[in-house]
Amino acid sequence: MFIDTELEKSFGDFGALIGAWGEEKPDARALADSSSELTWREVAQATARIAAVLQRDGLQRGQAVAILGTSNIPYALVYLAVVRAGGCAAPLTTSATPAQLAAMFKDSGAMHLFVDAAKLADLEGVALGNVKIVMLENAVGDHPALADWMAEEGARFDATPPAATDPFNIIYSSGTTGTPKGIIHSHGMRWHQMAGGFKSIYNRDTRSLVSTPLYSNTTLAVFLPTMCHGGFARIMEKFDALAYLDHAQTDQTTHTMLVPVQYARLMTHAEFDHYDLSSFIVKFCTSAPFAAELKADVLQRWPGGLVEIYGMTEGGVVCMLQAHHHPNKLHTVGQPVTGHELIVLDEDDNRLPAGSKGVLTGRSPTMMSGYKNQPEKTREMEWRDADGNIWLKTGDIGIVDADGFVSIVGRAKDMIISGGFNIYPKDLEELLEAQPEVTEAAVVGMPSEAWGETPVGFVRLTDAAASPDSILARVNGQLGKTQR
């Protein structure tokens, strides 16, 4: 049948699979959030109706469509529909400031913005240009609700299969106050992740619990394979430990992706051991350092496999630690996955011999097409070998042991990872030094039980009587939520 044949291809059509699952298992659950649930028939029909009107509005092949709001079913439908229509999904970071969001939107080149009421209010007064605004839920003013804006039932759209090089999505880097970097992922890159790398992990019976935002690549690493293989995904609007445990037990969740701070909150929750989590097949973790002690606790008390994924949104090398198979390697991030190559470079970009400590650098079939509109930034990430092959530098200092397991021992990049999000100290230092009372500033990451790391600023003042609280309030007012 079409689905089995398509999933066996080295490159296939993700959008066509969404429609095919609607025919293959029309009455099976596909999506759920806190207020509703959709079958695969309903998902296939709704995404077709959205795709049809996007094309009628003039959406060009590969053109971005921006999405901004709390993760829920309408958000997921738009994401899937954009891909089915031949567009490029551009989810925007909800924690960003209005100015940052405006910069992302402009950079994306989108002519449509799907948004919820709360984020639309945040954008009041922000110039977005000639854009069609559609509300993800209820209509606001002249902006129609998604349910009313969709094309008529049975509407058809041009479902020409994508090329492997066509853009699938743009993921905007978090934690920067300057021009955002839009990381472009191609259909070929995503297909390799969804149908290639995860072929043996996901199937039509998968039940995933999604508790991180849909604008994050962390989330897509589970959400997209679940959809590709015809499974079921419950989307949480906001992570809450007790609600997560309730959903996991009720839905008999099989797959999930969490960042370390979420694992910590779950494992320390007083009710954790009272829940039946025996349905779990695999739990993933990525985006931030995952303490060996926490991994051990998860292995001991939470049924199912535990897999740590190390890599960048930009791609390059991906390492996986199957912690349940290698309990003596919990201090590492695992080994490069099949088809991924890893080398180590010194500070001058010279290749180092095996066993050396240096900048982890990799290449694989899952590499970004580049940063949108920023070729110079793309080149800064790249390293070329003698044969002209492109490798991507992670910015992490690491070492590979005799068994091929990778340990992270530091960073070459000046970056703080807080709650799974990247924060660049230089950006914060520039804002602090722009304050009239500040002559010099330094920002460092401090250990945090709640977030892993949190940024702390140190300043030299022109006047000892200046108020640090006032400076802090002004600077935080210019930062996104995750940067404060």
Which residue stretches match the model-derived regions?
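Conserved AMP-binding/adenylate-forming
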Residues: 10, 36, 51-96, 422
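AMP-binding/adenylate-forming catalytic core of the ANL superfamily
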Residues: 96, 113, 248, 256-259, ...
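Conserved ATP/PPi-binding loop(s) of AMP-dependent carboxylate-activating enzymes
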Residues: 335-339, 350-383, 421-423
